[in-house]
């Protein structure tokens, strides 16, 4: 019964992490807004910034990985490798979220020293969508940290309890 509960707990965590990464991916991909000022037209989309593209690619990789691991049998010998891949996915989410947050902050506040003006006043819907994607990405990251701890406990704990 305990093993079944642990398996279901891990499955729920993986499913939630998959959903959060997929939500971050979809919201970021659909973020776009066009604004016109007098004769000047401005279109904001995620492909304008390399950090947002990296965020999309990272969340796509994590989503595919999360989906595939859902179907891995519990008796598989690959679970030790899954712990390593969980760590890689956690670091991938961390780096992509950090880069996207930095760019989003510049978009929102600007950077007076570099002469970059904030754009969120002109394209608020775009900025709101980016914020939503970043929130979903942060949720995915937190779930992956929990999943990593859970995976480490599941794989390492049996070795610690064995008698020599």
Curated annotation (Swiss-Prot):
Protein family (similarity comment): Belongs to the Casparian strip membrane proteins (CASP) family.
Subcellular location: Cell membrane
Protein name: CASP-like protein 1C1
Record organism: Arabidopsis lyrata subsp. lyrata (Lyre-leaved rock-cress)
Cytoplasmic side: 1-7, 73-80, 151-164
A cellular component term, taken from the record's GO annotations: plasma membrane
Entry-linked Pfam families: CASP_dom
Transmembrane segments: 8-28, 52-72, 81-101, 130-150
UniProt topology in membrane: Multi-pass membrane protein
Keyword list, A-Z: Cell membrane, Membrane, Transmembrane, Transmembrane helix
Residue intervals on the Extracellular side: 29-51, 102-129
InterPro entries listed in its UniProt record: CASP/CASPL (IPR006459), CASP_dom (IPR006702), CASPL (IPR044173)
Subunit annotation: Homodimer and heterodimers.
Nucleotide-binding in keyword set: no
Superkingdom of origin organism: Eukaryota
Keyword Cell membrane applies: yes
